[in-house]
């Protein structure tokens, strides 16, 4: 299974003055596999330490931060020497050993030859709680579920994935129906590695759904096991409400849907816990679609999405036939799935997302982002509906923007906006860069 992040890891490896690297990501998005795959492919040796299960290694760090003694102790435990320049050191579930966190500072300052990558399932929570975290001494990379492009490669469609990335619209046109079929399949499978692997090997939708439900159970167990006891009920309320929140015409998150009289301040900790775990994405409203978007952020209004479109489908129990054949059940929920998909693709591609709505609610844009000096208003259409009323409002009132509608239709450039195929939406910034006048 090819992951795009492997290329970024290789860049990190070859960077002069690199720092220890921390990979962030939700449980079961493939962090451990990625680190081991990177180590076995690009290093002559790797050392894997899981602080959740390796009590000896944990004790070595807890006894003091003399790095030479720690390395010596690890070598004794492993029964082999650790060659700093040719070995990848992997610290997994590092949140279980705060002293290992702290040691990263000293590795960066004193033992610069060592290649160190760390990760953990609840790393975001630990980062908020750990006051001795080595600020400025580490680098971060975020790992998300497989993108649609990675999914295509995993199911044996590498050439098709490459064609999509080329943005050769003429050559892509004959493969539109095939791409739409794979896209709808991705709506069901999602990007969780175990689900993708099972589908790639067996094409068994039922077994994929079993895996997704198992992942959901693991997340719910994490709520009880790792979150503060008093916050757990509120975490569950937010988590369970997300499909219904996304099914609304106006997808702004409404706390009143959780329970009567619910207030935002009562749920702040629960919301942040879910974000820190990488389980949700919180997208703020902007009051104006103008540069810089951050300056117009309205923190009181936001939308909440899940980490994965397949997990969203599993939560509402959408069956594969509904999605692939487009029956009434899918028709009712397709807008939510499509928005969830677009959000994943754009965030995985490195974009910071917002949404926009007019003060009186007369118009709303699903997403808005900026690329260099360009503001991109984005209206999402689940099928081939070419109406884009809200996009038209923005285009007329903010002429310096680059309006885009994304849908199942083919690429087309119109006088006031661009229709961009859903299957290629992760390459939207690339396309705009190509269109930008060269100085």
What are the language-model segments listed below?
Residues 53-84:
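Short glycine-rich substrate-engagement loop in P-loop NTPases that contacts/grips substrate
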Residues 34, 38:
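Hydrophobic positions on the alpha1 helix immediately C-terminal to the Walker A/P-loop
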Residues 31:
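Conserved lysine of the Walker
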Residues 23:
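Hydrophobic anchor at the beta1->P-loop junction of P-loop NTPases
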Residues 197-364, 368-370:
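Accessory nucleic acid-recognition modules appended to NTPase machines
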Residues 127-247:
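Interdomain motor-coupling "hinge/lid" segment immediately C-terminal to the ATP-binding subdomain
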